[in-house]
């Protein structure tokens, strides 16, 4: 669902449909296994991607539900690195006036990297946060580490999303 929406869908309508299906599958998984952290994570990722595709400001009504899903996921399994990626991206994407926080996002990304230093989505997120904070040298170091990663946790995400974004950020204008 979220993978289909990220990789195969070519229009926003297709992405929204894929993420909606993913949300529904996640909701059913939670009903069947309410103590399963991956079920909560799957629901949260699809909800976040749906909101991101629709537009962050147009999707603020989902924020409290998404934060609760993240909390439940981390309560169930605080070692799940992908949950920290989700939490960090939410705090990065949501404007501060609506509850987002670059400092909190940085903390989530760093905690996730402490659990899995090869999770390139976490490192990319950290690089984006540092860049937005004006910490350009640190950001470039993290973004180069994404490109230099020899054993990414998720090679598909690394090759289709993380490395291309890191390359773009490194070659683009500085903030």
Could you describe each region identified by the protein language model?
Residues 29, 72-73, 111-112, 145-146:
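Canonical positions in the second alpha-helix
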Residues 3-12, 49-58, 90-99, 132-134, ...:
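Short coil/turn linking the two alpha-helices of tandem helical-hairpin repeats
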Residues 3, 42, 49, 86, ...:
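"A position-specific structural signal for the A-helix of alpha-solenoid helical repeats
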Residues 132, 136-175:
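Terminal, low-structured helical/coil segments at or just beyond the last alpha-helical repeat
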Residues 10-24, 54-71, 97-111, 134-142:
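Structural signature of tandem alpha-helical TPR/SEL1-like repeats
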């Amino acid at each position: 669902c979220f993978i289909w929406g990220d990789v195969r869908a070519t229009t926003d309508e297709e992405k929204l449909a894929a993420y909606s299906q993913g949300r529904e599958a996640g909701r059913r998984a939670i009903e069947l296994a309410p103590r399963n952290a991956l079920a909560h994570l799957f629901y949260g990722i699809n909800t976040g991607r749906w909101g991101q595709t629709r537009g962050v400001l147009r999707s603020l009504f989902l924020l409290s539900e998404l934060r609760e899903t993240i909390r439940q996921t981390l309560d169930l399994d605080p070692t799940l690195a992908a949950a920290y990626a989700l939490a960090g991206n939410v705090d990065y994407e949501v404007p501060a006036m609506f509850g987002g926080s670059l400092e909190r996002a940085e903390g989530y990304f760093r905690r996730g990297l402490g659990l899995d230093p090869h999770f390139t989505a976490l490192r990319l997120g950290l690089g984006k946060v540092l860049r937005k904070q004006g910490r350009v040298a640190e950001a470039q170091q993290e973004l180069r580490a994404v490109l230099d990663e020899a054993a990414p946790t998720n090679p598909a995400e690394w090759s289709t999303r993380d490395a291309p974004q890191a390359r773009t950020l490194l070659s683009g204008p500085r903030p």
